[in-house]
């Protein structure tokens, strides 16, 4: 078995990187519903996002000079990123956290492929008792869940990597109304997504993180700003 020609023929740096480093037998299970419906644009977007965030993670790992770490992926969905990290960093412990994983999904992936990936079925709002992690990652965090990812990172981790998705929260609207500097900055930006990301960076700073922002134009999505932070 190999990747479909619609993916193999796509000449893109991140897609080629992904294919070289991730076996199709695992990929075909994780992405089975999308492959069956031939949702190739969606699949390519997901692959590119995984590589974009993986590159940030890899740089942070290189700075720490160790490949032995604990990583939580919050709201992991199909957990493609978690599996990619588990495959490429076999000394790591990777935990995918989401509301529900099917028994078939868990048994197929845990027993057949990697022994360093684990699953927790829990609402992110109910997470109160995790062991400390080195990294917390979330891709596609929607609305106020992006704030909650930062809160959980502040509580349980030294680093976080976040790719926000849907925009807005009550705190964001209040912050825009009451923050004079933000209003001046926002008047110069005609992109609500970037405004939202700027707010989230400021929110993370208030939780004692040193923040970096990276726009990754190689990710096949308009929601391509990666926020990553280290606890001060």
Regions found by a protein language model. Give the residues of each.
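Class I S-adenosyl-L-methionine
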Residues: 1-232
């Amino acid at each position: 078995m190999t990747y479909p020609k619609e993916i193999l023929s796509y000449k893109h740096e991140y897609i080629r990187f992904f294919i070289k480093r991730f076996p199709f037998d695992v990929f075909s299970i994780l992405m089975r519903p999308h492959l069956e419906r031939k949702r190739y644009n969606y699949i390519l977007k997901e692959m590119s996002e995984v590589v974009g965030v993986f590159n940030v993670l890899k740089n942070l790992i290189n700075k720490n000079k160790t490949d032995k770490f604990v990583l939580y992926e919050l709201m992991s969905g199909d957990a493609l990123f978690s599996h990619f990290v588990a495959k490429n960093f076999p000394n790591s412990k990777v935990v995918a956290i989401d509301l529900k994983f099917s028994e078939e999904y868990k048994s197929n992936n845990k027993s057949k492929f990697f022994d360093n990936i684990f699953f927790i079925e829990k609402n992110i709002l109910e997470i109160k008792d995790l062991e400390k992690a080195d990294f917390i990652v979330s891709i596609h965090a929607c609305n106020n869940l992006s704030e909650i990812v930062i809160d959980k990172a502040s509580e349980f981790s030294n680093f976080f990597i976040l790719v926000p998705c849907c925009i807005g929260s009550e705190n964001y609207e209040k912050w825009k109304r009451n923050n004079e500097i933000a209003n001046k900055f926002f008047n110069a930006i005609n992109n609500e997504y970037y405004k939202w990301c700027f707010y989230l960076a400021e929110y993370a700073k208030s939780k004692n993180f040193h923040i970096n922002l990276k726009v990754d134009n190689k990710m096949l999505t308009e929601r391509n700003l990666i926020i990553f932070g280290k606890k001060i």
